[in-house]
UniProtKB/Swiss-Prot annotation:
Record-annotated Asparagine synthetase domain positions: 280-541
Pfam families associated with the record: Asn_synthase (PF00733), GATase_7 (PF13537)
Organism of provenance: Drosophila melanogaster (Fruit fly)
GO biological process: asparagine biosynthetic process
Occurrences of domain Glutamine amidotransferase type-2 (ranges): 2-180
Protein name: Asparagine synthetase domain-containing protein CG17486
Amino acid sequence: MCGIFCSVVNNVPLNSFNISSALKVILKNRGPDVQDEVVIDYCFGKILFAGFVLWQQGESVQKQPVVEDDFIFLFNGDIYNTSKPEYMSDTTWIAERLAECRCKEQNILKILKRLEGPHCLIIYDKREQILYFSRDALGRNSLLIERICNGFQLLSTSHFEDKKISLELPPLGLFRVKLNDLNSCVLYPWQPLNNYSTQLLRNLDLAIGWKTAVESPMSPDWMLNCNPAFSYNFYEFQYIKNNVNLYKNLIDQSEIKYTLSILHTLLSDSIKNRVRNMAPFCRLCMQKLNISPPCRHAKLCILFSGGLDCTILALLANQFVPVNEPIELINVAFESVKGQNISEKLFDVPDRKTSLVSVNELKQLCPERCWNLLKVNVTRLELQQHLTSRIKHLIYPLDTVLDESLGCAFWFASHCTHSTARVALIGSGADELFGGYTRYRNSYSRCLGNDLERQLAVQNELERDWQRISARNLARDDRIIADTGKTARSPFIEENFVKFIRSLEVYQKCCFGFPEGVGDKLLLRLYGYQIGLRDVVFLKKRAIQFGSRIANKKQNGSHQSDNL
């Protein structure tokens, strides 16, 4: 993961054009291995480019920004569908493609259409004085845009200041700004805009003070419709009352078995790419310049509540990590009561108990692996101190109670002092794809229509959440986890996996005719059962903010936080 920064300002003296010390610290936390800055002139002012790199790919670290004769390039992310050699980083590979096409606009669009993986990028065409910038269509990596005096700036993460206009750049496509006219912008969207994305674009225009013209969609290949046309319906099996018999019966159904085989192939490939594409050193050995690979310390961790999603990720990741390397399972718990005497019992929260059960399952299934369960205990005093001094800046510009709870939980988990990992797998997206949240069950039960109308109510809720997943979760989580020198990777949010799961009917993914812990995320629970998990596949969904005891259920998560 990297920190990237680009500031465009009209009429500014060179000696007053720099990154604030507070912001530089935050960006360097994202990319501690190498940093560089470049300032250039354009027709009406100056542009500052800065890159802060966390080395994860290639034989050696690639300094940013990349400066060529025709362009300047900043990149943050991972690309998984290129044919680049192992010694080359994604940044270098894309820069070479840009150099080959001399940064021509139509060729830039062709390159972007091909990319699969979480990323955001900034390209400056020196000859035409045009700035291009984008986030991937799923919005997995953070890129903020801020209005500043006489210009604007793009940055991976920011520093909270009152009265500053800042928002997450919506992941709608490739934006183009000609620097001789900062009042207008052009968008090449990934796909045709709907009501939600149109509103995001209006919000952007209003905040930054320009008007965006929308061109024809780029339409990446992975976005094309997928219609597997399966006919199975989980609701037809409600007569089976025993949960174990239900799962065995469903797995034996030919169409369901075939669906699970596709799910397995796609999810395994996603995890393999995210586990194998990392630097050969752990966090500690990276600091020792004279050490030779291979380092045998843990390089991979999983943010581990012990729930279904993260346990599946752990079990599959086991296939792709050398057997003599540990895998870290990081579990976070917050002090459940206030008091001066800190004891282990104060951290005996639901997710801690679940993690102990699930790690035992992993040890039974994979006894040759060293599973390091790292327990992170956070007192209320520590929580308040770090929230005020550091975490609130990473959550910014989001500001709700839910943002605070989730942001703090992920920050303390990924900041575990005993962790040597530089890549963190997280289960983001599973609930939105498979129907895991309680509100989906509520949509079904509260609908007074027929079964078709009930299914439509659930589908509408799923679609609404999927459209908002980047703005609600992904970009914030990227900022939070990257602050600890780790790269967050979300195997469930992979282009082809997402395309396949979203092509299934809602009754082929979940069934609210069955009780909690059985029918919600039913397809994923079946998959977990198929690969050998038992106890965890029948656990009820529990949000991390409640399982870790950081949040109070009486609070409304959508309300603005007093601490942000």
